[in-house]
A protein has these predicted regions:
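Alpha/beta-hydrolase-fold enzymes
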Residues: 2-3, 127, 131, 147-259
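Short, surface-exposed "cap/lid" segments of acyl-processing enzymes
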Residues: 34, 38-102
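Short alpha-helix in the alpha/beta-hydrolase fold that links the catalytic acid
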Residues: 284, 296, 310-319
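Catalytic histidine neighborhood in serine/cysteine hydrolases
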Residues: 314, 320-336
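Alpha/beta-hydrolase active-site loop
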Residues: 108-126
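Short beta-strand/loop motif that positions the catalytic acidic residue
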Residues: 294, 300-302, 306
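Gly/Ala-rich beta-loop-alpha elbow adjacent to hydrolase catalytic centers
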Residues: 137-146
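Catalytic histidine-centered segment of alpha/beta-hydrolase-like enzymes
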Residues: 308, 333-347
Length: 362
């Protein structure tokens, strides 16, 4: 083909892809194509069941999703899906999906999830799977959820605990950690302000955040990652797969869900600002939860380039538990990439699978 004609055709293809990406995004979204069954609904939660075509292990794998996100990250592409990977590795997979929370849910807090929804749903999974034990996986905020749930309920159901990108020592989390540490110092200078912020006196409607605000905040926490994704799109407009993947990830990032005010109280004003998990103990309502109560097999992961929760912030969990079987590993990518990137799928998923296979009952 003549070089000029070839260049023109390539430019035409780029314009076509760009036009589709801007004006017809929905038709390009590849996520959540894997079939599943909803086995139970409870309050603000649904339990998805992804049956393994060849179940090899007694204990099912339960993914607990963080709040604010939709479930696309667990089944992102037909050819790169976390749930499909583990299904085809011989595990029945369950995904705890939080429903679309809104302003009416502003009073929900950590205890609503770790002492109500999670116990109910894990019991339901155990009944459905006919297994006393599960392998439990939590990423980001869900890492806090599964850690605190396990600490409260060990050794009831959790045989293997996997915690990824979870802020245990929040002040050690790079620039973000230093920012929260500095704010806490300022707050501590005024007892009235400190009491107002930290004792739950702020009306929940004032600290409830919308999905749109959460989406903006997520991008602002890692602006370089967002800019790199836009750059990659513009440099690869002629590549069909790149454009479809960009549309899929864009849909995930742009369609976030509300954070209830009670959750922001516990996550931002407690976990991040006061950094109690570093000590291994956190007070939630009338419950004192101690991480030393975790005695099961523990797998801790951190993104090698995570700007939100650094490895230094995630790693201390192992030393705060009573587990005699602790594995820590760095995962390729940032806070989002550690769950979804091609490198993660190639390098980390097989490692996590092998770790789980060795600790599961055939």
């Amino acid at each position: 083909m003549h070089p000029l004609k070839n260049r023109l055709l390539k430019q035409q293809k780029k314009l076509k892809h760009l036009s589709a990406r801007v004006f017809n995004t929905k038709s390009m979204i590849l996520s959540q194509s894997n079939p599943y069954e909803v086995i139970e609904e409870y309050k603000h939660c649904k339990i998805r069941f992804y049956a393994s075509p060849d179940r090899k292990y007694q204990e099912p794998l339960v993914f607990v999703a963080p709040l604010a996100i939709n479930m696309a990250i667990y089944d992102l592409y037909p050819y790169r899906s976390l749930v499909k990977h583990f299904q085809h590795s011989g595990f029945d997979v369950y995904l705890l999906e939080w429903t679309k929370l809104n302003y009416r849910d502003r009073f929900l807090n950590f205890m609503s999830f770790i002492d109500d929804a999670l116990p109910h749903c894990i019991d339901a999974v155990c009944r459905h799977a006919q297994s006393q034990y599960v392998s439990l996986h939590g990423w980001s905020m869900a890492g806090v959820f599964v850690s605190l749930y396990t600490a409260m309920h060990q050794p009831e159901h959790v045989k293997n605990l996997m915690v990824l990108g979870c802020p245990i020592d929040s002040y050690a989390s790079g620039r973000i950690g230093k920012l929260f540490q500095g704010i806490n110092r300022l707050v501590s200078r005024n007892q009235t302000v400190q009491k107002t912020l930290y004792s739950g006196q702020i009306p929940k409607h004032l600290i409830h955040t919308s999905g749109m605000l959460n989406a903006l905040g997520f991008k602002m926490l890692d602006p370089q990652g967002w800019l790199n994704s836009q750059k990659k799109l513009l440099l690869n407009l002629s590549n069909t797969q790149t454009v479809y993947e960009h549309a899929t990830m864009g849909s995930f990032l742009n369609n976030m869900i509300d954070y209830p005010g009670g959750i922001n109280q516990d996550m931002v004003l407690n976990v991040w600002l006061q950094n109690p998990l570093k000590t291994g103990i956190i007070q939630l309502e009338d419950k004192l939860i101690e991480l030393k109560n975790i005695s099961c097999s523990l797998f801790i992961g951190a993104g090698s380039s995570d700007q939100i929760v650094t490895a230094a912030a995630a790693a201390p969990l192992g030393g705060l538990t009573s587990s005699q079987d602790v594995t820590f590993t760095l995962i390729p990518g940032g806070h989002l990439g550690l769950m979804s990137s091609q490198k993660t799928a190639n390098l980390f998923w097989p490692k996590l699978t092998a770790c789980l296979e060795q600790r599961s009952t055939p």
